[in-house]
Amino acid sequence: MRIGIDARKLYDYGIGTYIRNLVKQLARLDRETEFVLLCRPQDAPGLSALGENFRPVTETAGLYSVAEQIKIPWALKREKVSLFHAPHYVLPPLVPCRSVVTIHDCIHLMFPEYLPNQFALRYARSSIRMAARRADRVLTVSESSKRDILKFVDTDPDKIHVIYNAHDERFSHEPREEDVVRVRERYQLQDEFVLYAGNVKPHKNVERLIDAFQLVHARGLDHLKLVIIGDELSKSTAVRRAVHRHNLHKFVRFLGYLPEDTLAVMYRLAGLFVFPSLYEGFGLPPLEAMASGTPVVTSNVSSLPEVAGDAAVLVNPLDAGDIADGIMRVLTDETVRRDLRRKGLARARQFSWETSARRVREIYAQVGATMPSAAPPPVVADAGGAPHPVGGGKTPTE
């Protein structure tokens, strides 16, 4: 079986993390199956290093474009792929082979107002619904996301399989002291700070986090800093207004995107990680923080309670006061912090990319088992009555 994987989003934080860790673990587990990785030209050298059975194939079709609807199926046909794995919801209808699709969440269906225009909304809706119906198997990353898919798409629930994400191994490793010193000095992190990592799109609820942070200051922790990693302040007018409204310019810092090695150190330095998102298919940052031994405050909605279990303080993300209460509870009680660290480390160990990759391989095998095998050549009798295969093959007596 030759398996194709769409790796064009390798650069992305969320789906890119999924692709990077999946192919890395597949390379460790499987040295026999041929894998064809459709990728951007700049990603091909790194993917070539996975192993002899992993072959990157450059594909320049734009993501979420009309061109990919034609060019992806053509590439799969040209490369003689027998099973295609789409690691996000785009599964072109002309795909010439069996297929598996990973639908991480239904955010574009839950929050259509976040899309830039009506064309983008129609494209997202039709792509998700078509992928869920046409794929031989649908993978998703939480029971919460599975429920959401079934809410919006009329498809067989038995073909939807939940396979959890996991944190990257680097978040479980103690950073070198010199790296800690370097990060602390470069970003001037001498004071106690609360950390948020992610973008500032509306559903991430960063504006309400700023409101909650102001309440924390008003309750006496007025020395505390809030460090936001992942987006520049200029990306969100609402967040910028919230910082201005509460006069928190000296206490809220936006550091933009940071390399994962730097992020791993940031988690270790933070007194608390807070993630008040309104919706997540999985919610990777809280798990990364727990793997780093950092106490977590996160939302009590969507997949976040499923991922965090009892290893985080859960709050109502629609209530700035409740978010502030969660922050205060952790930062003012050493016993709570110690308990969250212990539970968080244990919880993070329950998620493994190796386990996830093994389950994905099982799904590939299930789909492969349903493929029609090559039919043997028909057998006819010659003039003397001896059977021989059509096409010039020899009889057993020749």
Label the model's feature ranges.
Residues 1-386, 390, 395-398:
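Carbohydrate transferase catalytic cores enriched for Leloir-type hexosyltransferases
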